[in-house]
């Protein structure tokens, strides 16, 4: 596939060539390689507020926000100050700190969870939550949803086979059938498929795990009280509900997705915002369940860098800034971006629907809202790559995949929106002119 490229990406190209000799694919997380859109990945040198600056000096309005955590934009002075103070006092202790207790208090105050365990990544959080659910229920099977991503945990990297509910086939080489043999996958937003799975395996399912709102098949919100119904079905069979709020937690509202639908899941995972953009995450839930964890209980979970004081400082500073007024601004910015994208695509006659889950959004290049992964794949996906690259070449950094969510920060300015509006005009034309290969 051929794409227009910026006139100045020489250093990004040079560093990407070096990286490919040292790192698989030249990146440390696959989506960064621009694999689904083609073209030259940009190497970012620094960022301030709403602006990314690459190694060639090109500036971009940031609509990725490091995949969610940058609520206030990049390098917010209060977060930077908190990190600087923490660094001076030591990088890691391998011992309890006051800060980690205070961060746990912040999480408990804003959500439904009663106790919290800090970990190092969203993957660790979901892996640990599933282990805990299995230990608590003394059951093995788990139920997840097609298109919901929960990190690169072996049992959760699975895609659905044929039928309403089926044992999943592994979705990556290196994951054996045995590792996913207890994983059941059903379509998202399909409550009957969930009921059928529990009817087929009564008393065998340890937990349902779902993104609180889908953000990895594009943006797909739960419909018709879906999460509440999941909780009821799980509890009726003695199973638990895990809601994955790694993406939505403290991003979609002051209380995360819990603030949107008020569903108090048995276990909840957090990441991204909770660490202020540094490598940390958490999971929490009802005290009765959490107390099954070592050293209090028999379910083992540990981490040398868990509760890292620098990451904790960044997370606490970010949550302190994330008051209700901040979400008013972020929601307004998401609405404004939504309108600009839709207006530009409508002007060019491009069939589309802007998918929303609070202030998270994505584009479905087809008429009507998508409610599951099949819906999101049944669109003119070929239109996204030229749309993306035209935005990029006009100074707007959007997610480099049609199946990723767009994020806004409170740092966006009127000038940023003017730049976005101007970039969307040629981008929408490029989408309109795109042809399926």
From Swiss-Prot:
Location of N6-(pyridoxal phosphate)lysine modifications: 272
Segments forming a coiled coil: none
One MF term in the entry's GO annotations: transaminase activity
GO CC aspect terms: cytoplasm
Catalytic activity: (S)-4-amino-5-oxopentanoate = 5-aminolevulinate
Cofactor: pyridoxal 5'-phosphate
GO biological process, one term: protoporphyrinogen IX biosynthetic process
Localization in the cell: Cytoplasm
Domain of life according to the entry: Bacteria
Entry's EC annotation: 5.4.3.8
Protein keywords: Cytoplasm, Isomerase, Porphyrin biosynthesis, Pyridoxal phosphate
InterPro entries linked to this entry: 4pyrrol_synth_GluAld_NH2Trfase, Aminotrans_3, Aminotrans_3_PPA_site, PyrdxlP-dep_Trfase, PyrdxlP-dep_Trfase_major, PyrdxlP-dep_Trfase_small
CDD domains: OAT_like (cd00610)
Pathway(s) annotated for this protein in UniProt: Porphyrin-containing compound metabolism; protoporphyrin-IX biosynthesis; 5-aminolevulinate from L-glutamyl-tRNA(Glu): step 2/2
Family: Belongs to the class-III pyridoxal-phosphate-dependent aminotransferase family. HemL subfamily.
NCBIfam families: hemL, PRK00062.1
Subunit structure, as described in the record: Homodimer.
Name of this protein: Glutamate-1-semialdehyde 2,1-aminomutase
């Amino acid at each position: 596939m051929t794409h227009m490229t910026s006139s100045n990406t020489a250093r990004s190209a040079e560093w990407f060539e070096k990286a490919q000799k040292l790192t698989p694919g030249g990146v440390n997380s696959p989506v960064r390689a621009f694999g689904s859109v083609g073209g030259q990945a940009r190497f970012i040198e620094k960022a301030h507020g709403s602006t990314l600056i690459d190694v060639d000096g090109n500036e971009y309005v940031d609509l990725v926000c490091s995949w969610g955590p940058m609520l206030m934009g990049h390098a917010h002075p209060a977060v930077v100050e908190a990190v600087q103070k923490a660094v001076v006092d030591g990088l890691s202790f391998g011992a309890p700190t006051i800060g980690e207790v205070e961060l746990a208090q912040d999480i408990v105050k804003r959500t439904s969870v009663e106790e919290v365990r800090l970990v190092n990544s969203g993957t660790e959080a979901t892996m640990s939550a599933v282990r805990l659910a299995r230990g608590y229920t003394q059951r093995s099977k788990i139920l997840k949803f097609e298109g919901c991503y929960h990190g690169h945990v072996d049992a959760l990297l699975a895609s659905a086979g044929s039928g309403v509910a089926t044992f999943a086939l592994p979705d990556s080489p290196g994951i054996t059938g045995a590792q996913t043999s207890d994983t059941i996958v059903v379509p998202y937003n399909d409550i009957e498929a969930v009921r059928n799975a529990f009817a087929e395996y009564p008393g065998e399912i340890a937990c349902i795990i779902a993104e609180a709102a889908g953000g990895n098949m594009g943006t797909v919100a739960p419909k018709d009280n879906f999460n509440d119904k999941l909780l009821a079905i799980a509890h009726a069979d003695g199973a638990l509900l895990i809601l994955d709020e790694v993406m939505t937690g403290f991003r979609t509202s002051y209380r995360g997705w819990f603030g949107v639908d008020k569903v108090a899941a048995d276990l909840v995972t957090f990441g991204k915002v909770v660490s202020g953009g540094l490598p940390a995450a958490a999971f929490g839930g009802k005290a009765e369940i959490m107390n099954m964890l070592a050293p209090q209980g028999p379910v083992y979970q540990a981490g040398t860098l868990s509760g890292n004081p620098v990451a904790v400082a960044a997370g606490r500073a970010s949550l302190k800034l994330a008051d209700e007024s901040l979400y008013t601004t972020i929601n307004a910015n998401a609405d404004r971006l939504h309108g600009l994208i839709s207006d530009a695509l409508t002007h060019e006659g491009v069939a589309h629907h802007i998918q929303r889950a609070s202030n998270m959004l994505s584009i479905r290049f087809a008429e009507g809202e998508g409610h599951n992964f099949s819906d999101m794949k049944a669109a003119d996906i070929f239109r996204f790559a030229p749309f993306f690259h035209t935005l990029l070449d006009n100074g707007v950094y959007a997610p480099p995949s049609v199946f990723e969510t767009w994020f806004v920060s409170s740092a966006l300015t009127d000038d940023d929106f003017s730049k976005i509006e101007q970039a969307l005009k040629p981008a929408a034309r490029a989408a309109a002119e795109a042809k399926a290969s």
